[in-house]
Amino acid sequence: SGYSEHVPKLIYRDPKHYYPYLKERWGAHPPEFGYKDIIPEFKAENWDPAAWASLFKEVGATYVVMTAEHHDGWANWDSDLTPWNAVDKGPKRDLVGDLGKALRKEGLKYAPSYHRERHTGFFAKDQYAVHSEPHADIAEEIKRVPEAAMLYGPDFSYSKNYVDDYVARWKEIQEKYNPDMLWMDDFPIYTRDGNRVRKGQAKPEIQYLDDALR
């Protein structure tokens, strides 16, 4: 039901499929046990960025794109903006930074990718609507563990707060890692509110992207 990187969302959108598995595997399901509670098991014990970089060069790659953040709100870099990052939780190391250093030693270009454009709808009651609220079980998880709001949210709408947060994280990646290229995902083409996202609410980050490329 869906594909791997969308499982965090599908847990809540397809509970008949996923809740029994979580119950069997971890003894509970949302809201008692949700996506946030799986993160400690992400340890990256076999993560060897030097070996990866060497292999990429060997096969003839000239640049590498690694996911800095997908739609789920988890940051694979050493972020000062969210506690849900790979240095403070999970692997306890800077995955984005470590790979970048290894790639540059091999003379390869580096482009952390950023997919937060679709984050507001990932855990929302109404997917990709301009204005929504958290899925019921997500809301209950946040009520029980307030820190979870920084993973699942902080907003579930294309609000000014969302845009400010989006730009701040994107800017942090640029300032900390100085990537050779910028790669970002697309904003949802359609929304239930007349596609206002593409028509205006994304302008701040698009302008920042344009300025950063110049």
Residue spans for each PLM region:
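Mature catalytic domains of secreted/periplasmic carbohydrate-active enzymes
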Residues: 1-214
